[in-house]
């Protein structure tokens, strides 16, 4: 038992929630509650912790993020936190979707 087996990163399209989380992680490494609060502020909707960690695990399986464990809260007696950071694949994915969105927006303007 123990660790979950990670699959080989397979290129798959990110979900809308994953794209929002990728953009949040552009700030640098963050732990789960920081990501949750930033998501809820940006999207103006609740993101339950279970849904957040399921999404983050899926993003790690896809190769978009990497988790770092064993970092303690500011005081050394705080809880061990699981931090997440973007990988180069996550950054590339975010750039690709930003370009696609810009092209789609420009195309709509020309038609409209």
Where are these regions (language model features)?
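Short, Lys/Arg-enriched N-terminal segment that forms or immediately precedes the first helix
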Residues: 1-11
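N-terminal helix-turn-helix DNA-binding core of bacterial DNA-binding proteins
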Residues: 11-51
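Short beta-strand micro-motifs in enzyme catalytic cores
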Residues: 80-82
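Amphipathic alpha-helical dimerization/coiled-coil segments
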Residues: 3, 89-112
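Short, charged/polar surface micro-motifs in flexible loops or helix N-caps
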Residues: 27-31, 60-62, 89-91
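Beta-hairpin "wing" of winged helix-turn-helix
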Residues: 62-78
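Basic amphipathic alpha-helical segments that dock to polyanions
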Residues: 52-54, 58-59
């Amino acid at each position: 038992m123990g660790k979950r087996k990670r699959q080989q990163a397979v290129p798959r399209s990110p979900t809308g929630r994953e794209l929002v989380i990728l953009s949040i992680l552009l700030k640098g490494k963050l732990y789960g509650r920081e990501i949750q609060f930033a998501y809820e502020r940006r999207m103006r909707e609740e993101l339950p912790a279970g849904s957040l960690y399921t999404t983050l695990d899926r993003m790690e399986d896809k190769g978009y993020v990497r988790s770092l464990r064993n970092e303690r809260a500011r005081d050394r007696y705080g809880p061990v936190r699981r931090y997440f950071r973007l990988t180069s694949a996550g950054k590339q994915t975010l750039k690709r979707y930003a370009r696609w969105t810009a092209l789609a927006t420009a195309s709509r303007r020309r038609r409209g």
